[in-house]
């Protein structure tokens, strides 16, 4: 006789999903970085970098506190070395304020 082993209850945990917002400055940073790499005759590398930057930003929707705490309440996360996304968590939003080369002085 078959035994009823039942089914596991569905996971009722709520997953927090933040809205990720890219500021005009952050978008300008991405375009400048990608443009610079493209000008060096490396358009495919520039496209891959842009995808990685945007994917890292999108990943902050489910894990906004993943980046390390930086200055003035900001956080930062390395998207692909040496490029760093600098952002703030504001309520239920992640606001990406800039994208910087890790060797550049913060402003």
Swiss-Prot record:
Keywords: Toxin-antitoxin system. It holds the Pfam family ParE_toxin. InterPro entries: RelE/ParE_toxin, RelE/ParE_toxin_dom_sf, TA_system_RelE-like_toxin. Disruption phenotype: No visible phenotype when deleted singly or as the relBE4 operon. Toxic component of a type II toxin-antitoxin (TA) system. Its toxic effect is neutralized by coexpression with cognate antitoxin RelB4 but no other ParD or RelB antitoxin. Belongs to the RelE toxin family. This is Toxin RelE4. The gene is relE4.
